[in-house]
């Protein structure tokens, strides 16, 4: 990549062809692998889980990351919870990943502050939450920017092999989205061969599920940086 792009690993434990306990173990191993490799953000995106199971998995992931941070103070990885601000707060996650039709980033920040998250007593949490927003149009990107989101994830940029009904936006649309006053991460069909073109179009980084989860993450990070 021409510059050091941000890297965002989005989890999907259902891609592992195992029983549920093994899936959870393998996912936690991938989360640790991503953190050690220097991935900037990890989104726990296990939408099928009941809230109690999601909380349990999130707590395991956060405990794991905190253990890694103890030995590596410069560990950059932040854990975001998909959609569930309540779970993010309850477990001490670093932030939340919102859909475009979720509550606004401003509301999340207000709730976060009222709950006392990120105070010195919880020094492993940020003083302000990391708030990512999924966007599928320039209008949604503009809205995310106006509501003080940390960054927007623009998708799908390229065709995804498992989403025949999802029309890719393409690099031209990504370039237009990147004109907004907010960092943009490109998602959707990202590979090692096309990731460079996303940064050249103005993206601040890339987000992916398969690219990270189905490969050696350390090797992927080295190839991208």
Spans of model-derived segments:
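Flexible, gly/ser-rich surface segments that form the specificity/activation loops bordering the active-site cleft
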Residues: 155
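Glycine-biased, low-complexity coil/linker segments
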Residues: 117-118
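Acidic, Mg2+-coordinating phosphoryl-transfer loop and its flanking beta/alpha structural elements
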Residues: 204-208
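Conserved N-terminal beta1-alpha1 strand-loop-helix module at the mouth
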Residues: 1-105, 109-114, 128-151, 166-169, ...
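Conserved beta-loop-beta/alpha segment of the NTase-like Rossmann-fold superfamily
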Residues: 161
């Amino acid at each position: 990549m021409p510059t050091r792009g941000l890297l965002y690993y989005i989890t999907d434990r259902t891609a592992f062809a195992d029983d549920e306990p093994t899936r959870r173990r393998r996912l936690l191993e991938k989360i640790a692998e991503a953190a050690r490799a220097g991935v900037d953000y990890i989104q726990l995106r296990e939408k099928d889980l009941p809230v109690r199971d999601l909380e349990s998995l999130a707590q395991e992931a956060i405990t794991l990351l905190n253990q890694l941070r103890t030995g590596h103070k410069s560990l950059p990885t932040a854990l975001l919870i998909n959609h569930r601000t309540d779970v993010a707060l309850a477990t001490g996650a670093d932030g939340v990943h919102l859909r475009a039709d979720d509550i606004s980033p401003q509301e999340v920040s207000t709730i976060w502050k009222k709950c006392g998250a990120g105070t010195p007593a919880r020094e492993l949490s940020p003083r302000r939450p990391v708030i990512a927003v999924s966007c599928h149009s320039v209008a949604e990107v503009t809205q995310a920017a106006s509501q003080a989101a940390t960054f927007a994830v623009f998708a799908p940029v390229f065709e995804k092999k498992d989403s025949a009904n999802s029309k890719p936006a393409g690099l031209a649309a990504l370039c237009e989205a990147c004109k907004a006053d907010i960092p943009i991460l490109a998602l959707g069909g990202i590979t090692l061969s096309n990731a460079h073109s996303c940064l050249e179009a103005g993206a601040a980084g890339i987000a992916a599920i398969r690219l990270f989860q189905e490969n050696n993450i350390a090797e992927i990070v080295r190839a991208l940086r």
